């Protein structure tokens, strides 16, 4: 499970960085997005509620928020797994992220339809290379406020 979350964090990191000088970012990207599903090579991956991380995009940065089960079935903020704010950039329908540790760019195709955003990436799993599709749902302002409260507790 931990390897899955690390892989998920890596994939999300790949799609979640932007530079301040990029002016073609769709305004629709800005806001909070909650993971709904992951598909690897057309095979759905089951997710618990606590595995449904949140990405928050501002005009210049993104932040990834992860959760864990507190042992009672309640999802709580996982500070250790969450990723601090990072810059990102967008070119058309491609989000380009840079892994700051190795300075390598990772592109991911994205599409926004209504309140859903879909990312398509090449991911490396234990069984090799996979075509991964991640679908997120846009959070309401109230849901975003609740996420911020979880972070601050």
Identify the residue ranges that each predicted region occupies:
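Sec-dependent signal peptide hydrophobic core
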Residues: 5-10
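C-terminal motif of bacterial Sec signal peptides marking the signal peptidase cleavage site
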Residues: 14-16
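Lipid interaction determinants
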Residues: 19-83, 91, 96-153
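Positively charged n-region of N-terminal signal peptides that target proteins for export
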Residues: 1-4, 18-19
């Amino acid at each position: 499970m931990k390897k899955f979350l690390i892989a998920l964090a890596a994939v999300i990191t790949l799609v979640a960085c932007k530079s301040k000088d990029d002016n073609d970012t769709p305004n629709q990207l800005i806001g909070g997005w909650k993971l709904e599903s992951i598909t690897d090579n057309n095979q759905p991956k089951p997710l618990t509620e606590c595995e449904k991380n949140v990405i928050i995009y501002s005009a210049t940065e993104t932040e990834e928020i992860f959760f864990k089960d507190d042992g009672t079935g309640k999802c709580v903020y996982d500070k250790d797994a969450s990723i601090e704010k990072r810059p990102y950039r967008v070119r058309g329908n491609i989000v380009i992220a840079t892994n700051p540790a190795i300075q390598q760019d990772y592109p991911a195709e994205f599409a926004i339809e209504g309140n859903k955003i879909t990312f398509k990436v090449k991911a490396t799993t234990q069984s090799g290379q996979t075509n991964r599709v991640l679908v997120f749902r846009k959070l309401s302002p109230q849901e975003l406020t609740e996420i911020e409260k979880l972070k601050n507790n």
